[in-house]
Amino acid sequence: LYVFDMQNNVRKEIKVAAFKNQNLSLSYKPAEQKQRDMEYVSPVWLGDNDRFFLVRSSRDLHRIDICSYTIGQDSIVPIIQERMNTYQETRPLAVLNKGKELIHWSERDGWAHLYLYDDQGNLKNRITKGPWHVEQVLKVDEATRTIYFVGNGKEEGENPYYEQLY
């Protein structure tokens, strides 16, 4: 990973290595509703002018780290670490309260659910639970602390593959 200082025309290599043959991907802000039909939307990193977020994963996807990088530092910092002996999927991170809180999607209990963390990686609380699957977070209303998400398998007597908005 390289960070470029465009004003001074200087590049800086950031230390990111943790796993052999790892994958590193930037986390991006979701596109705004008004941009959904645009042919090209410039990606904007998830974060602010001081810090942004990345996902680092092992090749076999048994180890996944949600990391942050603070501008000016020499390395990224793992905030949330997921370790399983099976393949894991990931979903985009949701950032709240100007980066002080994070909503993380995880399959750690065998189901896919949402967890609230502080910006240091401390689990504040589990948001969803039960024998059903959260597919994705669509929107977070920070004023009311309401999360709109898609899930399936929660409603009894309904085909578990039908997705619902919650």
What are these regions (language model features)?
Residues 2, 65-67, 113-115, 164-166:
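A short loop-to-beta-strand structural motif that recurs across blades of beta-propeller domains
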Residues 2-14, 48-57:
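Extended amphipathic secondary-structure runs
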Residues 5-39, 69-92, 118-141, 152-157:
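Multi-bladed beta-propeller domains
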Residues 22-23, 61-63, 113:
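Short catalytic/ligand-binding loop motif for oxyanion handling, primarily in non-cytosolic enzymes
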Residues 45-48, 53-60, 69-70, 94-110, ...:
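Beta-strand C-termini and the immediately following turn/loop, strongest in propeller blades
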Residues 62, 75, 161:
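Residues that flank catalytic or metal-binding motifs in active/ligand-binding sites
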